[in-house]
Amino acid sequence: LFVAPDWKETIVHRLFGGGGGACIHSEVIDVDGDGDLDWAGTLSGDHPFWLENPGPETAHKGAWTPRMIDLEITGVHCIRRSDIDNDGRDDLIINNFEPEKGIGDSISWLSIPTDPLNARQWDRHIFADKDARGGSHYMGVGDIDGDGWKEIAVGAKGAPFADGNWFAYWKNPGAEKVKGAWKKVILAENQTAATNILPADVNGDGKVDWLASRGHGVGVIWFENPSWKIHDIDTEIRSPHSLTVADHDQDGDLDAATCGYESERVMWYENDGKGNFTLHTLDDKQQSYDLRTEDMDGDGDLDLLNAGRGTMNVVWYENPLKK
């Protein structure tokens, strides 16, 4: 935990005994309904868990209590927060990255149990049942067809995994069918090293499109709803293994940003509101495995928070809009 404004570090948890690998992805979510944000995360070779925030008086003073989310899901690469069943409470979407372990080649959404402090496991609902092969990476969640129910998309990187290199989403069937398997819709195949995908009305036509990156390959693109025609945003950036979408310049349309860990460039893509992007290089000596949009300094504009990869750092980029 890094506490603003001086970013003093507090260690809130050390890796579980026997847990292998690194914590690749995480979310903040109020699990226990006490009004503060808890933390949900994963070890790349183990099961998802959450850390109970002890409250504002002691959150920065030591360890948080760890509790399990699921005892079978293994090799998690992404965890997202969103209300999937429209009950007014956030759920978590988690993929099973390991094809031969846990619920291999599947993606689930998990609802918070009635008593999360004592539950052995959350309520798991497998919507992508064995049809998320190929090294599924990062999910995006949005209502693509305007029916009030959120779809879930993912990119699959391919090698060394079989049957990858695609972007797809799963159609949320809504109501009583939301807890079962959903229909998979392929957006595009032959997308070498596909990873990140997020919803955004890119061209301002009122339809929600998908914005995506080939995080183990080259390029950032967007898919136009409803034909899913591919439009290039950046054809040169290498390994854009992070993606964030927001109105960074506050002009009423959605922009995007990424960092290519091979290119070592942090890029901001300025949208003109019609799906045409101007490319801005914010840094040319930085790597990334994840990039988030946050108002880091509380000045009312959106900054960028970057978790470095080979650069082994955590940095943020101040939006000059409100300077």
Would you name each region that the model predicts?
Residues L1-K323:
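Beta-propeller-forming repeat regions
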